[in-house]
């Protein structure tokens, strides 16, 4: 048993639950939907990494293994991404989320080539992903304020379905990588492994690019593409604006939300990359990626007023004066 295989998951789990408690406290004060959904995602993070800690110390039972896979592979990225969509519910970000979910469905179908007997699961995942994507895109076009609710309805239904599938699936094969003793999904049937892709793609991409979009909103902008081009203008204008943002940072004039949201984006990307590598047999970085990613997100959220206006442990320990919220900036 590797020392780091116990310490890193324990650190990730403890930090996740502390983080979730702080976000829940903020939700109690402000009653913003994105905070509640993010807190759910962080609890899922804590349960998944807690299962890794228990598996590393007590041994991997089928129950611990199922908890790890359900929360880690399906629910963590999905709920954190859904929280981001709630934060950006006054924008047209639902189009991006819809495209990400549809792309995840296509990747599910493509992944069936790697897992024999998973073709039915791949086609089912693709069909459900396309229906969800169409519903979210339609809500974004017709009633923008409902886009996050539509996505959440599909996510809750999907959570119930995959929970039943994961908890009852027949397990065959190894739970751990033989060299690094890191958990791998090899014991689960192929149809479940391909079904996790839309949850990961939709949620993970929403969290990463939602944070980058939030950074773009607050940074000093250089528009090389007219704003009337809509979403097509965001990417080139974002990169064109980066030098000005760096200059403003050096001069101490940059809105603190810009580095905060970039930290969140990088923090979301790190475990996404290491989890993807885990799927392809590169397992040594898995626990480290989970921990470092969570630390970066935590630091980013701490300096982001959109989440933390004050920090309390029974009483207010630290606070700052309110300024324009992200929702008001994009509304």
Residue map of PLM features:
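Juxtamembrane loop-transmembrane helix junctions in multi-pass integral membrane proteins
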Residues: 2-6, 26-29, 33, 60-67, ...
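C-terminal transmembrane-bundle signature of multipass membrane proteins
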Residues: 207-218, 241, 245, 249-331
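Membrane-helix boundary/juxtamembrane motif in polytopic membrane proteins
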Residues: 142-160, 192, 212-266
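Extracellular-loop-to-transmembrane junctions of the mid-late helices
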Residues: 4-12, 115-133, 137-216
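Alpha-helical transmembrane segments in multipass membrane proteins, preferentially the mid-helix core
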Residues: 18-23, 79-86, 132-146, 200-227, ...
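Individual alpha-helical transmembrane segments in multi-pass integral membrane proteins
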Residues: 2-16, 32-134, 287-295
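Membrane-interfacial loop-to-transmembrane alpha-helix junctions, especially the N-terminal start
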Residues: 29-42, 92-101, 148-156, 254-263
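C-terminal ends of transmembrane alpha-helices
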Residues: 46-58, 108-121, 163-187, 268-280
């Amino acid at each position: 048993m590797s020392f780091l295989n116990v310490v890193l998951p324990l650190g990730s789990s403890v930090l996740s639950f502390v983080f979730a408690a702080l976000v829940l406290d903020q939700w109690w004060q402000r009653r913003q939907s994105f905070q509640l959904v993010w807190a759910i995602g962080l609890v899922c993070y804590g349960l998944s990494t807690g299962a890794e800690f228990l598996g590393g110390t007590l041994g991997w039972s089928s129950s611990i293994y199922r908890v790890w896979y359900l929360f880690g592979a399906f629910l963590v990225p999905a709920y954190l991404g859904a929280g981001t969509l709630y934060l950006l519910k006054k924008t047209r970000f639902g189009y991006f989320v819809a495209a990400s979910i549809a792309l995840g469905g296509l990747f599910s179908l493509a992944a069936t080539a790697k897992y024999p007997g998973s073709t039915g699961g791949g086609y089912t995942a693709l069909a459900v992903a396309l229906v969800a994507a169409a519903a979210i895109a339609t809500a974004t076009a017709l009633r923008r304020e409902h886009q996050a609710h539509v996505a959440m309805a599909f996510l809750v239904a999907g959570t119930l379905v995959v929970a039943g599938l994961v908890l009852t699936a027949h397990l065959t094969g190894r739970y751990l990588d033989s060299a690094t003793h890191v958990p791998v999904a090899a014991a689960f049937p192929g149809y479940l492994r391909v079904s996790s892709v839309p949850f990961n793609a939709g949620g993970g991409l929403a969290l990463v690019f939602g944070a980058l979009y939030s950074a773009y909103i607050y940074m000093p902008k250089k528009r090389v593409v007219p704003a009337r081009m809509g979403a097509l203008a965001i990417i080139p204008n974002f990169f064109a604006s980066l030098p000005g943002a760096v200059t403003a940072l050096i001069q101490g004039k940059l809105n603190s939300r810009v580095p905060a949201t970039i930290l969140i984006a990088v923090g979301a990307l790190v475990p996404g990359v290491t989890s993807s590598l885990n799927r392809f047999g590169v397992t040594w970085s898995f626990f480290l990626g989970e921990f470092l990613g969570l630390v970066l997100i935590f630091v980013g959220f701490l300096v982001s007023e959109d989440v933390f206006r004050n920090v309390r442990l029974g009483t207010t320990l630290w606070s700052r004066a309110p300024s324009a919220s992200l929702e008001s900036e994009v509304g």
